[in-house]
Amino acid sequence: MKITILAVGTKMPRWVDEAYTDYAKRFGRDITLELKEIKPEKRGGGVTAEKGIAAEHERLIAAIPPRARLVVMDERGKNWTSVKLAEGLKEWMAGGGDVVFVIGGADGLSAELKQRADVLLQLSAMTLPHGMVRVMLAEQIYRAYSILNNHPYHRE
């Protein structure tokens, strides 16, 4: 199974890339975690937040593989525990196909993309820095994977 994190934004600090890579390489052969960065729309010069979100929406849609399960990260999404994420991961693995997690840009995501999501999920009700979200999401996906594999990484 392939899990992709689509994240609007490029040029993260080195610590973000290093932390993400640390979690991404921990998976076994049955799961691959991949990060795809989506170029953010430049703001200013007549480009409103709405126009920026629309342009980023088109880039995100183009990057989502057909038939992939879509999980959109949003601070108003469902508040799952790590165990609930593991249950979701187990269900997605059994159903076959790939999973795409989407992290929006500075101005958020389009309503259309949120409506298209199979799951609207939050890491926190608070707004978080995008680099931190990449790392936290990769960690939680790995934690869910470790729960399913009875690995001692996760403790209740």
Swiss-Prot record:
Its main location: cytoplasm. Disulfide bonds: none annotated. One of its GO terms (cellular component) is cytoplasm. One of its GO terms (molecular function) is rRNA (pseudouridine-N3-)-methyltransferase activity. It is found in: Cytoplasm. It catalyses: pseudouridine(1915) in 23S rRNA + S-adenosyl-L-methionine = N(3)-methylpseudouridine(1915) in 23S rRNA + S-adenosyl-L-homocysteine + H(+). Gene3D superfamilies: 3.40.1280.10. S-adenosyl-L-methionine binds at G104, L123, S124, A125, M126, T127, L128. Keywords: Cytoplasm, Methyltransferase, rRNA processing, S-adenosyl-L-methionine, Transferase. Its EC number is 2.1.1.177. InterPro entries: Alpha/beta_knot_MTases, RlmH-like, tRNA_m1G_MTases_N. It comes from the Bacteria. It is an enzyme of class 2 (transferase). Belongs to the RNA methyltransferase RlmH family. Specifically methylates the pseudouridine at position 1915 (m3Psi1915) in 23S rRNA. Homodimer. HAMAP family: 23SrRNA_methyltr_H. This is Ribosomal RNA large subunit methyltransferase H. The lineage of its organism: Bacteria, Pseudomonadati, Pseudomonadota, Betaproteobacteria, Neisseriales. The gene is rlmH.
